[in-house]
């Protein structure tokens, strides 16, 4: 397993951004992103320009094409799509037909941008007011929008805390949804300690063969993403045991230097359990077994599929101490993770 730093929500001067598509790609290269999506409002006109600068200047990033479908009822992110479609017939009370058209037009993953943004009357249309009935039509939720800066600066406006809790509820209901962050870039971002997204990719080389941007799209569809301020981890279940593999190599927020003095706390939440467990990091890369912690979840119903969601905190489980989130573990009784 390897981790790829990605940014999946960005704008250029093709819509309401201040950087051209070329400037955005150069910025992403400088910031060591691996894959960057260009999701201008209701247009794909920047895709060709972004591809051109990547090729001409031999940048090391990959472009993931996309759109932010911008309506008065919410903003829909469509990744993998290469042309805008007509959305004048979008029914906010039954948007599934339109979501199907997005998929048919090439959208590989469909997500909700800043669903709990403050909305009317301050930012009309930014809050998700679509009445979604079939959540199987949605592939991911942007649970941290960091366009307003840190949580202390703009969390009450962007509604990130609500979005994270909503994502967890939907996942525990059984929906297969990935969680991502989004810088929602409109101008060159400041360097602030905000959540970023990593995609978990396979080591086999198969991902590189199909293209890194397609591999990232696949990670979103498989819910193999993590939102983090530094620590990289993935988790899986083996019967009633939870396993976590942590990697402290990320230089984001100097995590590669800070991890040894960290006092992490893992919060595990399922339908039957909610536990807070202190962890101890001893090596730069290690596997940690938490024996028997999933037993109650399994015993509640031995036939069904089980899911837990994880968060990692520093010191205690106060929201402002959140280090990593957006991690789900799904398994069946008597077996391992799906």
Kindly give the residue locations of the regions a language model identified.
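C-terminal functional module detector
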Residues: 1-3, 23-24, 174-178, 183-338
């Amino acid at each position: 397993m390897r981790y790829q730093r990605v940014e999946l929500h960005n704008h250029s001067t093709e819509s309401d951004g201040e950087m051209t598509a070329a400037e955005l790609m150069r910025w992403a290269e400088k910031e060591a992103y691996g894959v960057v999506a260009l999701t201008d409002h209701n247009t794909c006109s920047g895709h060709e320009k972004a591809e051109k600068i990547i090729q001409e200047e031999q940048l090391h990033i990959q472009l993931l094409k996309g759109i932010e479908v911008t309506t008065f009822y919410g903003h829909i992110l469509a990744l993998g799509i290469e042309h805008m479609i007509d959305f004048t017939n979008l029914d906010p009370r039954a948007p599934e037909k339109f979501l199907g058209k997005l998929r048919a037009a090439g959208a590989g993953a469909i997500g909700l941008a800043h669903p709990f943004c403050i909305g009317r009357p301050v930012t009309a249309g930014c809050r998700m007011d679509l009445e979604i009935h079939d959540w199987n039509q949605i592939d991911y939720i942007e649970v941290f929008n960091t366009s307003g800066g840190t949580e202390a600066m703009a969390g009450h406006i962007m509604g990130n805390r609500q979005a994270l809790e909503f994502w967890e509820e939907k996942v525990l209901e059984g929906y297969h949804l990935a969680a991502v962050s989004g810088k929602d870039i409109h101008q060159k971002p400041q360097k602030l300690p905000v959540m970023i997204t990593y995609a978990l990719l396979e080591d086999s080389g198969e991902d590189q063969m199909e293209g890194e941007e397609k591999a990232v799209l696949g990670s979103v569809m498989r819910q193999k993403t993590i939102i983090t301020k530094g620590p990289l981890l993935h988790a899986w279940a083996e019967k009633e045991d939870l396993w976590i593999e942590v990697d402290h190599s990320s230089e984001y927020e100097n995590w590669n230097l800070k991890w040894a003095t960290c006092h992490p706390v893992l919060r595990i939440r399922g339908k039957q359990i909610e536990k807070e467990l202190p962890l101890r990091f001893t090596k730069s890369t290690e596997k940690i077994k938490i024996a028997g912690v999933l037993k109650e979840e399994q015993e509640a119903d031995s036939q069904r599929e089980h899911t837990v969601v994880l968060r990692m905190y520093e010191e205690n489980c106060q929201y402002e101490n959140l280090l990593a989130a957006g991690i789900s573990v799904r398994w069946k009784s008597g077996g391992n993770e799906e």
